[in-house]
Amino acid sequence: MIIHMMHMNLLESLIWLPFALYLFLKFINTNKFYFIILAGLTMCLSILGGYPQTFVFNFIFLGLFALYYIYKSYKSKDNKKVIQLIISVIIIVIISGGISSFQLFATNEFSENSERQNIGYEFAKQGSVHPLDIFTLFVPKIFGTFNWNDKADELSYWSVSKSGGHQEGSWMFTISTLYISLLALIFIIPAIRYYFNSKEKNFPLLFFGIVGLIALFFSFGGNFFVHKIFFDFIPLFDRFRNPGHITFIFTMTFGLIAAYGIDRLTEDKKQFSQFLNKKYLIFFSGFVLLFTLAFYTGIFKSLFPLSSN
């Protein structure tokens, strides 16, 4: 996600999730509760970052991750671990919510007296990612960029709705860009194939993959049905607009899957190389090359004739 300077509190809130996730995993592996105390303090910093939508996403992700391991422990009949995990979640909520309560209560009181108390769906879906934005995974500026002043030597964002494009305005470049680097993309598919062909299932690839895809579909907002379901049936989601702000969950989860692939390449090169082979690399490189050429030669833009009107 690319952030407006005026939206830095969004970044200041979301940035704590990877560290909280790391601490929670350390607790799972060691059963040492001081990691949970640190995780609670970390999530407190997420709340104090001052962007409610983002810290709600952070808590939901961490809660789902805890449920995933609670289910795994229950399935393996490790009741002691189940109890420990439930207690750990309660501790995180108490520490983070307790320390930041002075801000939470004030924020809730303010929201009850603001115009966003009863927002409609038309307002809530503002800032939706479009399925066409998936192309930004390969070329981040494929639709141009947010040209912040007349002297900036950048390609202006051209695919805007008033010209027949797919996005509501040039500012959507800061929300709808999904780029996580080509290096990460190279490893994602081999990592998934390796996981399903391996007996070792310690890495929660299925969890990250499913949650990441749900986050992506949610970010589509008014361009897909998932966001409307959350808006209608799940508390708090009718308080927020800009569903595209959830894309950091997609970025993180698929980045972790790519990291898993890199780890397997170093630890089990012979097996992993069956999936990260020359044939795959040639296909991937060729696709990216053709896609890049289509961008720089203007062929891609010519497929959107109305965007230049």
Where is each model-derived feature located?
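Internal/C-terminal transmembrane anchor helices
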Residues: Q84-F102
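Contiguous transmembrane helix-bundle modules in multi-pass membrane proteins
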Residues: H7-I15, F27-L41, Q53-T54, I60-F61, ...
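Periplasmic/ER-lumenal interhelical loops and adjacent helix-loop junctions
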Residues: S96-A191, R239, T297-N309
